[in-house]
């Protein structure tokens, strides 16, 4: 609808004439300015009871909003006001009854600034059970996922279910997770020929997506499927994770090593045209017999399932998990064909927060799959993030056209730091722990709210009509959820009490804030589990630079209760600076020693 309104109204001369005569029109990219987006989404929710995009706000010169809405047609239809009608009505009222609009703006601004206070709450399993129950209540047992159409992947909900089932043995949570992962793979929301997932499904079956692909969705889903493979060793999950990461590396990676925001849904002005096929096209490329069998496999029919053409999917294929191996070459040929037939445009912005998520996904896959290719991509991305976006107080949020823009916000610091920590787990280079700690220090120093939690913007950022704070997760985890996970991970990897105290304070704030709707902060609950359930750290003090075979096997497993650190002669000094509790861990007699630690206190070592 953003594209529709842009073409229908903002590219229309009649609309432009009215806008320019009576208003100062400002079009905001919500990805470049998520703080502005967050503030005015709350305005729309307060004034209308709902919110979404495109978001239309009319405000006074003092930035006080008095009208909010989402998509508006150029001309009124079916009792719905049109944009032209609205603009003329507001312009008339501004001339004749301005005080009424000013008063409405003041009232809306005052309501926006009145943020409810919540008391911290203790951490306990009941909150986890309540969240699992809320997800179960909206679970679609037939097609997987949660809620009805439109249906979103919500990878952070799935990651929560994975960890909750692991810690508690909850069979229902495990089934919800695994059925959803399978059904999303079978559907048209997954790109069977090129890898990666579309933004959301317009139906409950996951068949017909909104075809836009975004970096953050694919990074989070790659992470989710990688974790699922670590936990189950089901080959399908690894296949999907690798195909999704390979899509990002092939289609979204910039020359700098960073990653673009995503690819458009439209091709040649037609929604989804890039992804649609007819049997005739397939048979022309693959031959009559191979093409016919391939079409039967992927539900490509003469009737089509989307405006007369077909979205490839496996929903009707009872042998969906046994797609012939030889079809991999066919899928690649069709992928190359469609790239020339209907090329896609990319959104070539690079965002620090989204690249942090991609760093997490690449690093986790490098560790889980023992992949030097993914590790090299992750290290190159980390280098770009340090040099391109920067670290510390001068970090920038966005890179575009060779320039960096806008001061970094909470999400940028939190997700980049989590990415650095995942890269440490994959590479054992302790400099990444130090980078993550520097980012975390910026969060605690510049983003903290007096009553708990963290604002989206720093204390020295541009002042909007209110300072936004998001606690609940949305399409991606909230900055507050990410900060909670960051503090917990730093506490475990460094052994420093300051990070454990920060983690407890943040999670107690979130437990109080989200007491009635804990499923809305699923990513934070993953961090909470690390404080509720027993954890341990394994420090390997190696006699040389080689990673012991036993350690490689241990760290490839799914074990959220275990952190692994490797100390070699070359990394010993830097690791001791990053994680002081490892200073006394040393090899003996030319052999590696393994130390089991909890809370920075280590037991006597054992030999491999």
Where is each model-derived feature located?
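Inter-helical turn/loop segments and adjacent helix faces that build the functional surface
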Residues: 164-168, 228-236, 365-372, 423-430, ...
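Glycine-rich phosphate/oxyanion-binding loops and their immediately adjacent helices
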Residues: 362, 367, 377, 419-420
